[in-house]
A protein has these predicted regions:
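Non-catalytic cap/lid and distal C-terminal segments of serine-dependent acyl enzymes
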Residues: 1-185
């Protein structure tokens, strides 16, 4: 009989603002391992000390999870540090071009995952759960770069993950908007 092990969630408030040029965009949408390193170096030791808990070091027992840009951040953390995290839950994941400041290694931000990174990289030992609503965000007028359609981005993610033989699940929710409350329940 399999049982779910004890789960400890550590939630981190993001910086202010949204999109490119915001503190939140810098924290969550930056295509690097810096945020995972910050969590590992500063957040988890403090949480463990204050809550008197011990976190597993087994990456198969650790997950990252987020909504919107937090969903992109969850995959960014696992992608850059699969030795730390191997489970990703991305709800209305912002796999679009939200990164700020510009990064020449990933010029299209999280859009790079389905555009280039996953297809061109060796398969990583991570499992991914994705969800998007059919009425999720599309911001064609904010940035006219063709990389701000949440539905298309998540559909593209599912396609490239399947082509690369990843362990993943893609949930396409009908009549659902961005981070749709009824879908969460």
């Amino acid at each position: 009989k399999k049982k779910l092990p004890v789960v400890i969630a550590v939630s981190i408030a993001n910086g202010t603002g949204d999109a490119q040029g915001s503190e939140r965009g810098l924290e969550y949408d930056t295509m690097s391992g810096k945020y995972a390193e910050f969590v590992e170096r500063e957040v988890l030791p403090r949480a463990a000390a204050e809550a008197h808990v011990k976190f597993t070091k087994d990456p198969n027992g650790r997950a990252t999870m987020g909504y919107s840009s937090g969903g992109a951040c969850a995959l960014i953390m696992a992608w850059h540090h699969p030795e730390l995290y191997r489970r990703v839950l991305a709800y209305s994941g912002t796999f679009i071009n939200q990164q700020w400041p510009y990064n020449p290694q990933a010029p299209h931000g999280a859009w790079e995952f389905h555009e280039h990174l996953i297809a061109r990289s060796p398969r990583k030992p991570i499992r991914i759960w994705l969800q998007v609503g059919d009425q999720d965000l599309l911001n064609p007028n904010v940035m006219r770069d063709g990389m701000h359609d949440w539905v298309l981005a998540n559909e593209n993610m599912a396609k490239v993950l399947a082509a690369k033989n990843y362990h993943y699940q893609f949930v396409f929710a009908r009549n659902a908007v961005h981070v749709d409350r009824p879908t969460v329940r």
